[in-house]
Amino acid sequence: MIIGLGSDLCNIERIQASLDRFGERFENRVFTDVERAKAARRPFTRAGTYAKRFAAKEAFSKAVGTGFKRGVFMKDIGVVNAPSGAPTLALTGGAAERLAAMIPPGHTAHIHLTLTDDHPWAQAFVIIEAIKD
């Protein structure tokens, strides 16, 4: 059963402006080590790489119904790739706790994530599914 749905649209140029203005301070505050390493490998599309991940974090916060409140922080939500290459989320801290609180007993959470970009926009959709054990 679907227990959460979130989407976000992010302006890549806005992310580039934050990178230009705040540099590593912005990167370290918002993105995980894995996300920063991926962006560093993509110097010509770094802002787009970050914008998709920023949108994914926003979409997840909407899917769990809290936004960035109640202990859910951007850095607790990391975009990673499954062995198949598909994007998914790795959660820690308050984000993981909020997701666990939403899942009914006898179910396991499954997060579906899709990312896309077409300059100047990046977009993410998150669907949280509870699958019966």
UniProtKB/Swiss-Prot annotation:
It is found in: Cytoplasm. Signal peptide: none annotated. Pfam families: ACPS. One of its GO terms (cellular component) is cytoplasm. The keyword Lipid biosynthesis applies. Its cofactor is Mg(2+). Its EC number is 2.7.8.7. Keywords: Cytoplasm, Fatty acid biosynthesis, Fatty acid metabolism, Lipid biosynthesis, Lipid metabolism, Magnesium, Metal-binding, Transferase. One of its GO terms (molecular function) is magnesium ion binding. Mg(2+) binds at D8, E58. InterPro entries: 4-PPantetheinyl_Trfase_dom, 4-PPantetheinyl_Trfase_dom_sf, ACPS, Ppantetheine-prot_Trfase_dom. GO terms for biological process: fatty acid biosynthetic process. It catalyses: apo-[ACP] + CoA = holo-[ACP] + adenosine 3',5'-bisphosphate + H(+). Transfers the 4'-phosphopantetheine moiety from coenzyme A to a Ser of acyl-carrier-protein. Belongs to the P-Pant transferase superfamily. AcpS family. NCBIfam families: acpS, pantethn_trn. This is Holo-[acyl-carrier-protein] synthase. The gene is acpS.
